[in-house]
């Protein structure tokens, strides 16, 4: 198997667009890794021009129009702790998909625990277990460690896809990541 990961933060509309493309057939990566974008070296504010670009890109990808959460940008730490728990129990992809869609297709603020729980319920995660896990120090530490490891691997922004030692950042880098995965798979087969 090719060593690869998709790094995301549920507060990132660009990660939402990238996640939809990864789900639509990137052919990998093997691991979906939640990290805190606010701790990355290049965390930047998201202005009006960037919102318009996201709207245009969503349309190009055939997604419904983006509905911006009223509190955007929202504090994603609770949602990211739940994403870390979801990864721990093998539900990272369905939880991330449901949460991204809650935020950017539904226009819901993921700093509100109710919307995080709706996303969790959509992928069969029990609300009491989710709330308990989100408060565990071990989950907080896993998220901090994953963010630090991503930075160490060269991730400076989300979304990012790592294929072996190469990191591809930004929603529009999906094609570069796809080519790297294809090349790595060809080398693995030979």
List where the protein language model places each region:
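Structural alpha/beta surface segment adjacent to cysteine/selenocysteine redox centers
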Residues: 10-103
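C-terminal cap of thioredoxin/glutaredoxin-like
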Residues: 4-6, 10-28, 101-190
């Amino acid at each position: 198997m090719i060593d690869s990961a998709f790094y995301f933060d549920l507060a990132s509309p660009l990660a939402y667009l990238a996640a939809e493309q990864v789900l639509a057939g990137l052919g990998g990566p093997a691991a979906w890794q939640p990290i805190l974008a606010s701790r990355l070296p290049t965390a930047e504010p998201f202005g009006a021009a960037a919102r318009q670009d996201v709207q245009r890109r969503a349309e190009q990808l055939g997604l419904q129009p983006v509905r911006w959460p009223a509190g955007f940008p929202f504090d994603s730490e609770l949602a990211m702790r739940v994403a870390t728990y979801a990864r721990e129990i093998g539900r990272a992809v369905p939880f991330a998909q449901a949460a991204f869609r809650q935020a950017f297709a539904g226009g819901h603020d993921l700093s509100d625990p109710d919307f995080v729980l709706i996303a969790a319920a959509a992928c069969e995660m029990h609300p009491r277990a989710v709330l308990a896990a989100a408060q565990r120090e071990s989950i907080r530490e896993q998220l901090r460690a994953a963010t630090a490891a991503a930075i160490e691997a060269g991730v400076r922004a989300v979304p990012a896809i790592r294929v072996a030692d190469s990191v591809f950042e930004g929603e529009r880098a999906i094609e570069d990541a796809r080519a790297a995965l294809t090349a790595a798979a060809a080398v693995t087969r030979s």
